[in-house]
Amino acid sequence: MKTRSRHLAKVVGALALAATLAACGSSSTAAVDSDGLTKLAVGNFSANTLTFPYVIANEQGLFKDEGIVTETVNAKSSAELTATLIGGSTQMAVGTPENVMAAMDQGQGLVAVAPFGKIDMALVVPGDSSITDVKQLAGKQIGVVQRGTFSERFAREILAQNGVDPEGVTYVAVGGGVTMEPALRSGKVDATVAATSSVVLIKSHGLDLKALVNTMDGTAGAVGEYGLQTFWTTTDAFKQANPDVVQGFCRAMAKATNWIADDVNRDAGMRSLEKLLDVSTENAGHIWDQVHTSWSTSIAAEQWQKNIEMTLGAGSTAVPFADHVDTSCK
């Protein structure tokens, strides 16, 4: 309950920001540039594998093929991404369940659009740790990116799946890979939730890690099967006013998703990851091998509902699939 209250407070703050931003932009009609291309402001995370399909769609000219030119608007947080979309400063944006679904639950007219990104999280401990099983985490300190965020929710789900009381551990905010590493080295935390890119980065610095569970290798149980980490979003108003633009965006992203899934593109994809993440060729290869099949161009209603319940609470029916997920993109 405390976690949900903390998160809802963040959502309320984000929605307040959105109300302020609404005066600065309009999401009703897409503009056209001098070349006749539709201009689309897209909210994005920079230097993050979560939006890799967007990177590839731009690099491969897939948006231009659909008559679209994108203006990337980078944000510092997922809450900011959702707020700027609602406020009209962007027309499409990557979203995370914790913010988008909560905003939908608060009555915001948002629509989820493909591609849908599989949850990429592992619960890891230092290689020399005596901890070898999730059950041994009872009473321990677990690192999460930030309190009340999806990484904490993931940890809670994994603990519960393994018979450990989620309230019986201490959650410690450790940030991303750069600040996560010293928290592990110093013993500030016994374990931490980390994405593939963070694990690869930390290992490259000489700190061995072992995964107790990992969504990318099937060891995370049910949450690894159905969990979503990202999807793309627009507003009902923009979709209704610009259906062809939304379809064009979605088609370009679907082509990018298929390009990434095809391992024949590994070398080119690695070069893109090197540039995106500022990592070595070797590390880019490790990341590619883990994540390149992480995105899907569709989602079933059952999977959507499971993510709603994981995010908003068991039994939640306030964000129905039919009203909030675009299924027309192929």
Would you name each region that the model predicts?
Residues 1-12:
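Bacterial N-terminal signal peptides that target proteins for export
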Residues 98, 172, 178-272:
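Pocket-lining segment of extracytoplasmic ligand-binding domains
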Residues 19-23:
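C-terminal motif of bacterial Sec signal peptides marking the signal peptidase cleavage site
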Residues 30-165, 171-177, 190-196, 209-213:
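Short, glycine-/small- and polar/acidic-enriched structural segments
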Residues 308-330:
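Conserved C-terminal helix/tail region of periplasmic/extracytoplasmic solute-binding proteins
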Residues 25-27:
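Bacterial signal peptide processing site
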Residues 239-314:
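Secondary-structure end/capping motifs
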Residues 65, 214-225, 293-301:
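Short, solvent-exposed loop/beta-turn-alpha elements that line the ligand-binding surface or hinge
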